Amino acid sequence: MDFTLMLPLICVFGADILFFTTIKSNKLDFKGKDQYRFIIPGIVILFIGSLFAGKNFTFENILITIGLIIFALLGNTCGVGKKGITTGSWFTAWSKVDDIYVENQGDKCILFYSNKNIKKRLIFKKEEENELKKYIENIIKDYNIKK
């Protein structure tokens, strides 16, 4: 196995480990969906499709595929917890959030939040709206976040 194949393996499995530790260390009280939740699984499907099209089933490619499938499953974990917000396995601590609010849009409840660099939204079930609003109100009070 040469270096050009080792580097993707190291990166993919390193990202898997990073995502797994992020998810495990930040217990989610409310699980939601990210607005871009189809991107990572789409990339994995394209990669697997290219392997089938090229009939390039080497041991290294199979290992990368296994790592990418784990990446696709872990990479879409989103929600709100006591320590902060997890979006696609990217963790944002409450101290980094500048603005946050919950809005009702039809049959879903949407949490909007932003900091200096990003504006994101998470989609939750309509049934969780009241509990989520109370939870966010407490977080706003505890961390002095703008509403």
Describe the role of every protein-language-model region:
Residues 85-87, 112:
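Short hydrophobic/aromatic-rich beta-strand segments that constitute the beta-sheet cores
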Residues 82-83, 97:
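Alpha-helical transmembrane segments and their immediate juxtamembrane interface regions
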Residues 109-147:
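A membrane-cytosol interface segment of integral membrane proteins
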